Amino acid sequence: MFLGTHPVRLDDKNRFVLPAKFRGMLDSVVLTRGQERCLYLFDRSEFERISDGIRNTALSQKKVRDYLRIFLSGAAAQLPDRQHRIVIANHLRAYADLKKEVTVIGAGKHIEIWDSEAWSSYLEEQEAAFSEIAEEVIPGLI
């Protein structure tokens, strides 16, 4: 399970070093558009499981087709290099409006990559409603 918050920097080639805690958990990865203008980084097998699940839904529904197009068309598969660096394609960097300072967060079965300022703003907005949200999405679990 991917956990934690890790500040990293993008180099001049749009690469970042994968946090040490995540290195042994990933071999081949897929980077794609995420929600709230962040990027999602999946282990390739998890990405295939999710994309298979989406493809197995009713493709006759326009919303399913639209989501599938956006999710898959931006995806980029790769292997981290020997220095554990991941390259962010230009179109994905633009989508998430990533600058030099980025934040890598563990989000359970995937990793999210945020512009650091955007992550700070998002966290500030969401923390205020955190306990209220818990009662709605996970009633009685915590």
From Swiss-Prot:
Pfam families this protein is in? MraZ
Top-level taxon of origin: Bacteria
Note the InterPro entries from the entry.
Answer: MraZ, MraZ_C, MraZ_dom, MraZ_N, MraZ_sf, SpoVT-AbrB_dom, SpoVT-AbrB_sf
Gene Ontology biological process terms in this record: negative regulation of DNA-templated transcription initiation
Q: Give the record's keywords alphabetically.
A: Cytoplasm, DNA-binding, Repeat, Transcription, Transcription regulation
List the GO molecular function terms: DNA-binding transcription factor activity; transcription cis-regulatory region binding
Q: Identify the PROSITE patterns for this entry.
A: SPOVT_ABRB
Example of a GO cellular component annotation carried by this entry: nucleoid
Q: Which residues form the SpoVT-AbrB domain?
A: 5-46, 75-118
Which Gene3D superfamilies does the record match to this protein?
Transcriptional regulator MraZ domain
Enumerate the subcellular locations listed in this protein's record, separating them with semicolons.
Cytoplasm, Nucleoid
Q: Does the keyword Cytoplasm apply?
A: yes
Protein family (similarity comment): Belongs to the MraZ family.
Subunit relationships: Forms oligomers.
Query: What name appears for this protein in its UniProt entry?
Result: Transcriptional regulator MraZ
